[in-house]
Protein backbone atom coordinates (compact mmCIF):
# COMPACT_ATOMS: atom_id res chain seq x y z
CA UNK A 1 0.00 0.00 0.00
CA UNK A 2 1.46 3.32 -1.08
CA UNK A 3 0.99 6.48 0.95
CA UNK A 4 1.83 10.16 1.17
CA UNK A 5 3.56 11.61 4.22
CA UNK A 6 2.88 14.93 5.90
CA UNK A 7 6.08 15.55 7.84
CA UNK A 8 5.81 18.24 10.51
CA UNK A 9 9.02 20.24 10.98
CA UNK A 10 7.68 23.69 11.85
CA UNK A 11 8.31 23.38 15.58
CA UNK A 12 10.01 25.87 17.83
CA UNK A 13 12.59 25.53 20.57
CA UNK A 14 10.79 27.08 23.54
CA UNK A 15 10.48 24.05 25.82
CA UNK A 16 13.84 22.81 24.57
CA UNK A 17 15.36 26.15 25.67
CA UNK A 18 16.89 26.39 22.20
CA UNK A 19 17.46 29.58 20.24
CA UNK A 20 16.38 27.87 17.02
CA UNK A 21 13.80 25.38 15.79
CA UNK A 22 14.48 22.19 17.77
CA UNK A 23 14.21 20.18 14.55
CA UNK A 24 17.61 21.53 13.59
CA UNK A 25 19.32 20.56 16.84
CA UNK A 26 22.16 18.11 16.30
CA UNK A 27 21.66 14.47 17.20
CA UNK A 28 24.88 12.53 16.61
CA UNK A 29 25.89 14.49 13.54
CA UNK A 30 22.51 15.14 11.92
CA UNK A 31 19.50 17.36 12.62
CA UNK A 32 16.77 15.64 14.64
CA UNK A 33 14.25 15.78 11.81
CA UNK A 34 16.57 14.00 9.36
CA UNK A 35 16.69 10.99 11.70
CA UNK A 36 12.88 11.11 11.79
CA UNK A 37 12.60 11.35 8.01
CA UNK A 38 15.07 8.65 6.94
CA UNK A 39 12.79 5.61 7.50
CA UNK A 40 10.20 7.13 5.16
CA UNK A 41 12.80 7.99 2.52
CA UNK A 42 13.92 4.36 2.68
CA UNK A 43 10.35 3.11 2.21
CA UNK A 44 9.40 2.66 -1.45
CA UNK A 45 5.71 2.79 -0.47
CA UNK A 46 6.13 6.45 0.48
CA UNK A 47 5.42 8.06 -2.88
CA UNK A 48 5.50 11.68 -1.73
CA UNK A 49 6.84 13.60 1.27
CA UNK A 50 5.32 16.96 2.17
CA UNK A 51 7.67 18.70 4.59
CA UNK A 52 5.86 21.43 6.52
CA UNK A 53 8.30 23.92 8.01
CA UNK A 54 8.74 27.56 8.91
CA UNK A 55 8.80 29.95 5.96
CA UNK A 56 12.35 31.06 6.77
CA UNK A 57 13.58 27.46 6.66
CA UNK A 58 12.06 26.28 3.38
CA UNK A 59 15.20 27.07 1.38
CA UNK A 60 17.41 25.22 3.87
CA UNK A 61 15.12 22.17 3.85
CA UNK A 62 15.13 22.02 0.05
CA UNK A 63 18.92 22.22 0.01
CA UNK A 64 19.18 19.42 2.55
CA UNK A 65 16.82 17.23 0.52
CA UNK A 66 19.10 17.73 -2.49
CA UNK A 67 22.11 16.72 -0.41
CA UNK A 68 20.26 13.54 0.58
CA UNK A 69 19.62 12.79 -3.12
CA UNK A 70 15.86 12.86 -2.66
CA UNK A 71 14.15 13.02 -6.05
CA UNK A 72 12.79 16.50 -6.62
CA UNK A 73 9.34 15.21 -7.58
CA UNK A 74 9.12 13.12 -4.40
CA UNK A 75 9.31 15.97 -1.90
CA UNK A 76 7.40 19.22 -1.52
CA UNK A 77 8.29 21.85 1.08
CA UNK A 78 5.45 24.06 2.30
CA UNK A 79 4.94 26.77 4.90
CA UNK A 80 3.47 25.68 8.22
CA UNK A 81 0.92 27.40 10.41
CA UNK A 82 0.91 28.85 13.91
CA UNK A 83 -0.52 25.60 15.32
CA UNK A 84 0.19 21.95 14.53
CA UNK A 85 -3.33 21.51 13.18
CA UNK A 86 -2.88 24.36 10.72
CA UNK A 87 0.41 22.86 9.54
CA UNK A 88 -1.29 19.53 8.85
CA UNK A 89 -4.02 21.38 6.96
CA UNK A 90 -1.35 23.03 4.81
CA UNK A 91 0.11 19.61 4.09
CA UNK A 92 -3.30 18.19 3.21
CA UNK A 93 -3.67 20.78 0.46
CA UNK A 94 -0.72 19.11 -1.29
CA UNK A 95 -2.06 15.56 -0.98
CA UNK A 96 -4.07 13.59 -3.50
CA UNK A 97 -1.56 11.28 -5.16
CA UNK A 98 -2.49 8.36 -2.88
CA UNK A 99 -5.62 7.36 -0.95
CA UNK A 100 -3.72 7.03 2.35
CA UNK A 101 -1.83 9.73 4.24
CA UNK A 102 0.51 9.42 7.22
CA UNK A 103 1.35 12.31 9.55
CA UNK A 104 4.59 12.28 11.53
CA UNK A 105 6.29 14.63 13.99
CA UNK A 106 9.78 15.70 12.98
CA UNK A 107 10.69 15.61 16.68
CA UNK A 108 10.20 11.82 16.83
CA UNK A 109 13.48 10.49 15.39
CA UNK A 110 13.01 6.81 16.27
CA UNK A 111 10.11 5.63 14.13
CA UNK A 112 10.82 2.28 12.45
CA UNK A 113 9.62 0.46 9.35
CA UNK A 114 7.99 -2.09 11.66
CA UNK A 115 5.76 0.63 13.09
CA UNK A 116 4.95 1.88 9.59
CA UNK A 117 4.07 -1.69 8.54
CA UNK A 118 1.65 -2.06 11.46
CA UNK A 119 0.05 1.29 10.70
CA UNK A 120 -0.49 0.46 7.04
CA UNK A 121 -2.12 -2.83 8.01
CA UNK A 122 -4.25 -0.96 10.55
CA UNK A 123 -5.40 1.67 8.06
CA UNK A 124 -6.15 -1.05 5.49
CA UNK A 125 -8.42 -2.79 7.98
CA UNK A 126 -9.91 0.23 9.77
CA UNK A 127 -9.30 3.32 7.57
CA UNK A 128 -7.82 5.15 10.58
CA UNK A 129 -4.95 3.90 12.76
CA UNK A 130 -2.49 5.39 15.23
CA UNK A 131 0.49 3.92 17.05
CA UNK A 132 0.72 3.98 20.83
CA UNK A 133 2.17 2.29 23.90
CA UNK A 134 0.39 1.40 27.11
CA UNK A 135 0.98 3.62 30.13
CA UNK A 136 3.49 2.08 32.54
CA UNK A 137 3.37 4.49 35.46
CA UNK A 138 0.63 5.06 38.01
CA UNK A 139 -1.49 8.00 36.88
CA UNK A 140 -3.36 10.31 39.27
CA UNK A 141 -5.83 13.09 38.63
CA UNK A 142 -4.72 16.21 40.51
CA UNK A 143 -6.63 19.45 41.14
CA UNK A 144 -4.95 22.41 42.85
CA UNK A 145 -1.98 20.22 43.83
CA UNK A 146 -4.21 17.70 45.60
CA UNK A 147 -4.73 14.12 44.40
CA UNK A 148 -8.39 13.50 43.58
CA UNK A 149 -8.18 9.96 42.27
CA UNK A 150 -5.92 7.26 40.90
CA UNK A 151 -6.82 6.57 37.28
CA UNK A 152 -7.16 3.00 36.04
CA UNK A 153 -4.24 2.71 33.64
CA UNK A 154 -5.35 -0.57 32.03
CA UNK A 155 -7.12 1.35 29.28
CA UNK A 156 -4.68 4.26 29.03
CA UNK A 157 -2.32 4.57 26.08
CA UNK A 158 0.36 7.14 25.23
CA UNK A 159 -0.29 8.22 21.67
CA UNK A 160 2.57 8.64 19.21
CA UNK A 161 3.09 9.38 15.55
CA UNK A 162 2.98 8.42 12.72
CA UNK A 163 -0.80 8.43 12.46
CA UNK A 164 -2.44 6.96 9.35
CA UNK A 165 -5.76 7.71 7.68
CA UNK A 166 -7.59 7.33 4.44
CA UNK A 167 -7.19 10.75 2.90
CA UNK A 168 -10.90 11.58 2.61
CA UNK A 169 -11.44 10.85 6.32
CA UNK A 170 -8.70 13.21 7.49
CA UNK A 171 -9.87 15.87 5.06
CA UNK A 172 -13.42 15.60 6.41
CA UNK A 173 -12.13 15.79 9.99
CA UNK A 174 -10.23 18.99 9.23
CA UNK A 175 -13.20 20.58 7.52
CA UNK A 176 -15.38 19.88 10.56
CA UNK A 177 -12.73 21.15 12.98
CA UNK A 178 -12.39 24.38 11.00
CA UNK A 179 -16.16 24.84 10.92
CA UNK A 180 -16.43 24.28 14.69
CA UNK A 181 -13.23 26.21 15.49
CA UNK A 182 -11.96 23.12 17.27
CA UNK A 183 -8.23 22.82 17.94
CA UNK A 184 -6.99 19.30 18.67
CA UNK A 185 -3.66 17.99 19.88
CA UNK A 186 -3.33 15.32 17.19
CA UNK A 187 -5.02 14.14 14.02
CA UNK A 188 -6.91 11.33 15.76
CA UNK A 189 -8.66 13.82 18.05
CA UNK A 190 -10.15 15.46 14.96
CA UNK A 191 -11.17 12.16 13.36
CA UNK A 192 -12.84 11.04 16.62
CA UNK A 193 -15.19 14.03 16.33
CA UNK A 194 -16.63 13.01 12.94
CA UNK A 195 -17.17 10.53 14.66
CA UNK A 196 -15.02 7.74 13.22
CA UNK A 197 -13.36 4.87 15.13
CA UNK A 198 -9.58 5.05 15.28
CA UNK A 199 -7.65 1.79 15.70
CA UNK A 200 -4.56 1.39 17.87
CA UNK A 201 -1.43 -0.44 16.73
CA UNK A 202 1.65 -1.12 18.83
CA UNK A 203 4.19 1.69 18.80
CA UNK A 204 7.52 1.64 20.62
CA UNK A 205 8.74 2.98 23.94
CA UNK A 206 11.78 4.16 21.98
CA UNK A 207 9.56 6.30 19.74
CA UNK A 208 9.77 9.34 22.01
CA UNK A 209 9.15 12.96 21.12
CA UNK A 210 12.07 15.26 21.90
CA UNK A 211 10.54 18.16 23.78
CA UNK A 212 12.76 19.29 26.68
CA UNK A 213 16.55 19.41 27.22
CA UNK A 214 16.34 16.25 29.35
CA UNK A 215 15.23 14.33 26.26
CA UNK A 216 18.48 14.86 24.35
CA UNK A 217 20.76 12.57 26.45
CA UNK A 218 18.00 9.95 26.33
CA UNK A 219 17.83 10.28 22.54
CA UNK A 220 21.58 9.74 22.24
CA UNK A 221 21.31 6.67 24.45
CA UNK A 222 18.47 5.26 22.33
CA UNK A 223 20.42 5.89 19.15
CA UNK A 224 23.38 4.06 20.67
CA UNK A 225 21.17 1.15 21.71
CA UNK A 226 19.81 0.92 18.17
CA UNK A 227 23.31 0.97 16.75
CA UNK A 228 22.66 4.23 14.97
CA UNK A 229 20.00 2.58 12.78
CA UNK A 230 16.29 3.21 13.20
CA UNK A 231 15.09 2.01 9.81
CA UNK A 232 14.78 -1.67 10.72
From Swiss-Prot:
Pfam families: IspD. Pathway: Isoprenoid biosynthesis; isopentenyl diphosphate biosynthesis via DXP pathway; isopentenyl diphosphate from 1-deoxy-D-xylulose 5-phosphate: step 2/6. It is an enzyme of class 2 (transferase). Keywords: Isoprene biosynthesis, Nucleotidyltransferase, Transferase. The record marks 15, 22 as: Transition state stabilizer. InterPro entries: IspD, IspD/TarI, IspD/TarI_cytidylyltransf_bact, ISPD_synthase_CS, Nucleotide-diphossugar_trans. It catalyses: 2-C-methyl-D-erythritol 4-phosphate + CTP + H(+) = 4-CDP-2-C-methyl-D-erythritol + diphosphate. SUPFAM superfamilies: Nucleotide-diphospho-sugar transferases (SSF53448). Its EC number is 2.7.7.60. GO terms for molecular function: 2-C-methyl-D-erythritol 4-phosphate cytidylyltransferase activity. GO terms for biological process: isopentenyl diphosphate biosynthetic process, methylerythritol 4-phosphate pathway. The record marks 153, 209 as: Positions MEP for the nucleophilic attack. PROSITE patterns: ISPD. The keyword ATP-binding does not apply. Belongs to the IspD/TarI cytidylyltransferase family. IspD subfamily. Catalyzes the formation of 4-diphosphocytidyl-2-C-methyl-D-erythritol from CTP and 2-C-methyl-D-erythritol 4-phosphate (MEP). This is 2-C-methyl-D-erythritol 4-phosphate cytidylyltransferase. It comes from Listeria innocua serovar 6a (strain ATCC BAA-680 / CLIP 11262). The gene is ispD.
